[in-house]
Amino acid sequence: MEEEKIILPDNAFRELKEGEKYEPVMSPQRTYAEVNGWSVTWGVLMAMLFSAAAAYLGLKVGQVFEAAIPIAIIAVGVSTAAKRKDGLAENVIIQSIGACSGAVVAGAIFTLPAIYILQAKYPEMSASFMKIFISSLLGGIIGILFLIPFRKYFVSDMHGKYPFPEATATTQVLVSGQKGGSQAKPLLIAGLVGGLYDFIVATFGWWNENFTTRFCALGEDIAEKAKLVFKVNTGAAVFGLGYIIGLKYAFIICLGSLAVWWVIVPGMALIFGDQVLNQWDPTVTTAVGAMSPEEIFRCYGKSIGIGGIAMAGIIGIIKSWGIIKSAVSLATKEMKGKGGDAKVQVRTQRDISFKVIAIGTIITIAITFLFFWWGVMEGNLLFAVVAILLVAVIAFLFTTVAANAIAIVGSNPVSGMTLMTLILASVVMVAVGLKGTGGMVAALIMGGVVCTALSMAGSFVTDLKIGYWLGTTPKKQETWKFLGTLVSAATVGGVMMLLNETYGFASGQLAAPQANAMAAVIDPLMNGIGAPWLLYAIGAVIAIVLTVFKVPALAFALGMFIPMELNIPLLVGGAINWYVTTRSKNEDVNKERGEKGNLIASGFIAGGALMGVVSALLRFGGVVFDYESWWASPLSEILSLVAYILLIVYFIRATKLAK
């Protein structure tokens, strides 16, 4: 099959008519060299590389980028260069194994760093590499096993009904064979530019990583008196993230951020000026009016965001209840009908048999139970039984929510669902008698397993849809996904420990916003102090009101919770996306520029994140440049703004090259 002839059928993205069948790009009647030394080696390499990059970026800014598109571009680039015969078939497997990186990373870094964060307060708490590795691995395996019975429902039965934005983009890259080879060049150049830019800041500190209105006396005055401050992170990777997220989603995230920073924070200083609000946290001894905007945000604003995220997760389950029922009944029918159906299935409809899935699920849950019993609960049978029941039920219920979210908007509200899991796990574990630091570690490991399972389910449904469009054998994707999970779990465990040793999660140099939220939620619950339920309730009410007005509540709540300096760059990137894709009167030119922008943004993200890992490795090895006193100077922030403007100008000029 020649690369040039590879095109998607015209019914790939629309609903099928009565009696119409979807014929994938690769014929179901032919056998292709999908799994071989080439595809497995590159897949494992991509899983390692992007796990390290995604873990660094996720812990630094709280956003995990989906690696599917950059991996697909690299796969197409290397297979074109090597003139591979069955390049398309191999590339789907490379992408499928490699894409485990983002899924496992999101699961691990949203929860497990909370153990390190709480360690500063409770030195007796500890997390070994094995605990991080095993919880990530088991969570990933559970996610894969729980999703396979729903493959046919999401991928085939709902064909054309769900947009699958990320799967669509990745499929287009894989299909564009020749074009994909040329796409690798701008991606690599952008990776070098973004990587060098972020490396200079992280390693040498030539300019500050943030620009704030505190750089001048007037701004400092406004921050202290009116509690109003503006901040923006000037990094290349976060800017690229904003471009890919797009203006609409970035705008809603920033609205949430500004609602907290410019309405709630100054509002609280005005209303409760001379009061010490420490009902939830006895360590707070300062009156609200005497706090800095940052302190008010940390003590009160974030909790409102947490309430919003949790409620958005509940709303997600309610909305998805019909899907859960349909998918479960379909899976049950498949299981019952499997034995009597002696027909050999067509290659593109072949899954791992339901018998194997059922046995695999039982074994995995049994191993998870043993891990909880001996590795986490120190031999307490009751705690281990309660823990495994909670994890299995929550992971199963939320699996379809995660897959549905990815199918519709391409983003997985995993942090909100995990936050709910943690609150539920903490309340239940305290009720059965597990409290204190042991309870915290247990609940966080449980949260880590659930979070990785949900993250994996969402990511995997993307892979399976790509395979469906292109004609891959689902069984091969499903089987080799386990290897990618193993590699990614080992990599993320190593990177997390490296970053903790280098920077320390409690230092403030790693935002790790989700893990900080988990730590903030779990600490009071496990110590009997009680949580700031009133603040959670305010956030929950905001989420309900937003849902009524059809505003994406999760995006808004995430903005309320993630620090402002990491939200504003998303808006900058989103605005540049809008600018680049609307400049020309010719729609085709706009579309081409937008796609070129996606490539450059992907390069910024991958390059910036990978060089961030290199910078952390250098620091770990003792190569440290002291730039703290320089960063305290307003000039470093002004220079930061100049560098940022130059980066944006470069980005816009680079997209213009697509004529």
Task: Write out the residue ranges for each language-model feature.
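Alpha-helical multipass membrane-protein architecture
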Residues: 1-659
